[in-house]
Amino acid sequence: MKLQNKPHTVRDIIVVGFALFAMFFGAGNVIFPPYLGVEAGPEWLGGFSAYFIADIGLAMCAVFALLRVGSSEAVTARLGKVPAAILMSALILCIGPMVAIPRTAATTFEMAIVPNISGVSSVVFSIIFFAIILFLCIRQSAVVDIVGAVLTPLLLIGLAVIIIKGVATPLGEIALTPNADNVILGGIKAGYQTMDALAALPFGIIILQSAASKGYTTNGQKFKIVSGSAILAGVLLLGVYMGLCYLGATVSTQYGLEIGRAELVMAIVEALLGKAGMIIFGVVVGLACVTTAIGLTSSAAAYFTELCSEKVPYKAFVIVICVFSAVASNLGLDRIVSIAAPVLDIVYPPALVVIFISLIIPKANDYVSRGAALGAVGASILCAFKVPAMENLPLYDMGLYWILPAVVFGLLAFGLAAVVKPKKKSEAEAKI
């Protein structure tokens, strides 16, 4: 088939790459790197590198795993139809309407509205916020273009103003020694706990749909535009995160680890740019949250539309998600996180397992995938119930306790497959 938009390939990569950057760059990603800079002090570059690999490195692995097998559904399909549907639905709900989408509104209200505008009701704000999300998401084919071509450039301008000012006129000297005991471990742990790799699966749904709508229909064409966009998004995230981490390092003699992450960022911005800086920061937080909310709402609606075989239209799911998220956002940010954190802790490890298997050994048999995922989810459930023995597992302190059980169960499943398949074959031959 002829590539319909071939003359615009570079433009499409830029627009889709900008959109992918903005979807990953939520408000939480604004506050993590500066705090890491305070923790690391003179070792901020090493801490940042560990953070970036564990955060965006994992997310990019998820994007390329998705590209390798063709779709988000194909990544989890090797688990079996029902387990795959349960895992993806739990994942979409947790990083969608149950947690991350309402959190975007709650974060915008607490970090952008309250410091700059007094007397605004959180209920009124949430209605306005999700009315905007509804308006921007209702046309599925336009979502990526709206985010990539309109909102992301504004977000990047706001971030550039803050970072360039902080680099040109540092707020202080970097501390001589780190404030944290193990900077690399802290960076890995912080990056892993952002769970951005999970978002890559639902974001992949709308990114691939956008590529198809632009005329990129073959696997090779989709790989070209999405891989190029992912690399661009990764480079932008690298620059922004590094800049924010450096800003934190420049105040490592002024603040200790007792300061809150959001409080630290607001203090840095106000010291750099004064009251005008707080307005700019409010715009940055608002845009970061809006773009992430758009991506999550659209991808969740697209997933559930496909799950029910389009018996319920995309627009209906967008409306339901926006209404539910508006209500949930008024429960308060801390309560939202506390409700869904245990569920996320359980679904994250098996999701990473199938992502890595799809990326590294895509031809692995389904027994291996199911066994490894079973080991990971079993370990996650035991940790959720705080079983003391789990603390003895390797990498427990980093939250990677599930790796050993996943490997062991995957190998056991591989051995089982080697025994079962020849047995079935011999039984079939005997019948002949």
For every predicted segment, state its role.
Residues G57, C61, L154-K165, G228-S252, ...:
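Selective recognition of specific alpha-helical transmembrane segments in multi-pass small-molecule
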